[in-house]
């Protein structure tokens, strides 16, 4: 784990216990990181970044050297992944609030094909607990609270794991211009939590 990199979205879908069913419905795991340059990977020749797991995925799969996002801002890029549409068609031309539901949403379409889809990590949707076709979510919204009754799943977990510690004490934010080593135990990092929750979801489905 690169400790100053936050995982924004881990989607697990098609987690089927039946081998025959799984043969027809392959498992799908989509991992999306937040605010990461395309060359910030060891497999891209960047010696400053240690990313063995992502490097292995790239080595065993397909590495797109000319792939690009239709919008470099996080929320419209996420809306593009969710809907398969360009910013001009899903309606988010820049950073801001997206729709609470879109006409076409990938998790809902997977559900129509009998997949069980679940979203884990930073969603940055509005409302914050919107499902967008997922059967359920576990969200990390950092300190962003847009309704008085909301607290992110990561924050609840952090309070149980590290009572008395403040997750904001690292002073590393999503939109900061600087980077730093995570000062708390690595197991408390949002990316570590996202990965562990995704693995637990797969194990227990």
Residues of each region from the PLM?
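Bacterial N-terminal signal peptides that target proteins for export
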Residues: 1-9
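Formylglycine-dependent sulfatase
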Residues: 6, 15, 19-205
């Amino acid at each position: 784990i690169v400790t100053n990199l936050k995982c924004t979205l881990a989607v697990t879908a098609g987690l089927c216990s039946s081998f025959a069913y799984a043969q027809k419905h392959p498992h799908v795991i989509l991992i999306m990181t937040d605010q990461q340059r395309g060359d910030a990977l060891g497999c891209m020749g960047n010696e400053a970044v240690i990313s063995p797991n992502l490097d292995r995925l790239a080595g065993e799969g397909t590495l797109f050297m000319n792939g690009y996002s239709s919008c470099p801002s996080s929320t419209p890029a996420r809306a593009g992944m969710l809907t398969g549409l360009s910013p001009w068609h899903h309606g988010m031309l820049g950073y801001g609030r997206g729709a609470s539901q879109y006409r076409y949403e990938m998790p809902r379409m997977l559900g129509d094909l009998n997949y069980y889809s679940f979203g884990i990590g930073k969603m940055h949707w509005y409302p914050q607990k919107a499902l967008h076709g997922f059967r359920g979510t576990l969200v990390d919204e950092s300190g962003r609270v847009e309704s008085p009754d909301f607290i992110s799943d990561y924050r609840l977990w952090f309070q149980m794991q590290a009572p008395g510690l403040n997750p904001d004490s690292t002073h590393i934010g999503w939109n900061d211009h600087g980077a730093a080593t995570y000062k708390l135990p690595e197991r408390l990092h949002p990316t570590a939590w996202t990965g562990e929750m995704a693995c637990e979801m797969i194990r227990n489905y």
